[in-house]
A protein has these predicted regions:
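N-terminal alpha-helical interaction modules that lie
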Residues: 2-128
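A conserved position within tetratricopeptide repeats
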Residues: 89-92, 123, 157, 190-194
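Short coil turns that delineate tetratricopeptide repeat
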Residues: 127, 160-161, 194-195
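Structural register within alpha-helical repeat arrays
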Residues: 135-136, 169-170
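Residue at a conserved register position within TPR or TPR-like alpha-solenoid repeats
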Residues: 139-140, 173-174, 209
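Residues in the short coil linking paired helices within alpha-helical repeat scaffolds
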Residues: 145, 178-179
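Alpha-helical repeat scaffolds
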Residues: 150-154, 180-193
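TPR alpha-solenoid repeat register
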Residues: 165-166, 199-201
Length: 209
């Protein structure tokens, strides 16, 4: 009876096929488990009743240090400045939140489905106010009111802005005033940030050091 030898390459192929099939099955099982967990969490979140949003999550802007100085502007620019001042002053009393690090599902689980529109509006208020501060800072800087621009930008930083332009302009103004200590403090604050903008801001600050 002749000897029958299985070619080594065939054994390797079968081994590879077994491992590949095993890993594929594991991935599919993991995917199914994750999908089931996601939809289970989603279903639970939709049933959560409205919960009070903790007061400490809200931002409380302070514009008491802003002077809104008189500027020598053309009529159209003067009207724009007047509108900007009104927007800043009226925004201060609006509720402001920044919960972008939480998914919609997590928001519903923590605060209830009914609070989603409330949260969305408060986040919109927050983002708008930060943009108003930046617009104001740029205008002040363009009209030789650097200290006023710094005050506005420092307030944005205090409110935990993650908008790069706030930090870029503030750092430039600090450097122009040779305020190395303030620049170091700003760098330390950015290092403690938990934001996708963090590294980009740090890279910019490093160039000024």
């Amino acid at each position: 009876m002749p000897n029958f030898t299985i070619p080594s390459f065939f054994i390797l192929f079968l081994t590879f096929l077994f491992i590949w099939t095993h890993n594929l099955r594991k991935r599919q099982e993991k995917h199914e488990a994750e999908k089931e967990a996601f939809w289970g969490k989603e279903e639970r979140s939709l049933a959560v009743r409205k919960k009070e949003i903790p007061a400490e999550l809200y931002f409380h802007p302070n514009i008491s240090r802003l002077n809104f100085p008189a500027l020598d502007l053309e009529p159209a620019a003067a009207e724009k400045y007047k509108t900007l001042e009104k927007q800043i002053r009226s925004s201060v009393s609006l509720p402001m939140l920044s919960l972008s690090d939480m998914s919609n599902t997590d928001l519903r689980l923590n605060f209830g489905t009914a609070n989603q529109p409330v949260i969305a509006q408060a986040e919109e208020n927050y983002e708008a106010f930060l943009n108003f501060l930046y617009e104001y800072a740029v205008l002040m800087n363009e009209h030789d009111h650097a200290d006023e621009a710094i005050t506005a930008l420092e307030e944005a930083v205090r409110l935990k802005s993650d908008i790069c332009q706030h930090y870029f302009l503030l750092a430039d103004l600090y450097q122009a005033q040779s305020a190395d200590g303030s620049l170091q403090i700003l760098t330390a604050l950015v290092q403690d940030m938990d934001s996708s903008s963090k590294q980009r801001i740090l890279n910019y600050l490093a160039k000024l050091s």
